[in-house]
Regions:
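Beta-rich carbohydrate-recognition modules and glycan-binding surfaces
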Residues: 1-203
């Protein structure tokens, strides 16, 4: 994973989440204790990583979670653009980019009042011929209020990891309704052993 913004990972350097020339207001808020970006008055917003451009050459997909209270039925659209500045880091030379448009008919579909997880193969950004010097993430569209979380690039198929790098999700079922064998979230019943002498595994 190469993370731009997520409590689940260590983020790379992002110089700004809203440049002086874009048309949006952005603030850091918490939703149920989780850090989240809140965009209001959104026309288009530019996040820039120009000090240390992002190398996503080994990644295969882009992820973003979004939530909006605004209408998402046609003709509303939400757009995501990735821009690579090239080896010289100059916007005016060697730049490649591509924009993806999402609406209420795409997969996944835009929705109102619900988190939508976007997992977009980088191969769909067909105009993005370079991925080693990604310097801009641009979002735009008709939803003018958008919550954004978990913005990262990742390698599908596990990306070569041999063990998890984040904990399993915390259970949400009330303890009164649970009999737990093993969980930090509940009081466990007695389990004599997790691997018997006659099984065939290492523990």
């Amino acid at each position: 994973v190469v993370s731009m913004f997520s409590n689940a990972y260590t983020d790379v350097l992002v110089d700004t989440w809203s440049t002086g020339f874009d048309q949006a207001d952005v603030e850091d808020v918490q939703v149920a204790g989780d850090d989240t970006k809140l965009y209001t008055n959104l026309v288009f917003s530019v996040a820039e990583a120009t000090t240390q451009p992002i190398d996503a050459s080994q990644m295969t997909a882009f992820h973003m979670d979004i939530w909006t209270p605004d209408p998402t039925a046609a003709p509303a659209v939400f757009k995501i653009k990735l821009v690579d500045f090239g080896p010289d880091g100059d916007f005016n030379t060697g730049t490649s980019e591509h924009e993806i448009t999402l609406d209420d008919t795409t997969t996944p579909a835009m929705a109102t009042g619900a988190w939508v997880s976007l997992d977009i193969p980088l191969s769909e950004f067909t105009g993005l011929t370079g991925r080693t010097n990604l310097a801009q993430l641009i979002i735009s569209g008709d939803p003018n209020t958008v919550y954004v979380d978990n913005v990262y690039f990742y390698a599908e198929g596990g990306g070569g990891l041999t063990e998890p790098d984040v904990a399993a999700p915390t259970p949400t079922v009330p303890e009164a309704d649970v009999i737990s064998l093993f969980s930090d979230a509940y009081t466990d019943v007695l389990v004599d052993r997790w691997s018997t002498d006659w099984d065939n595994t290492e523990f």
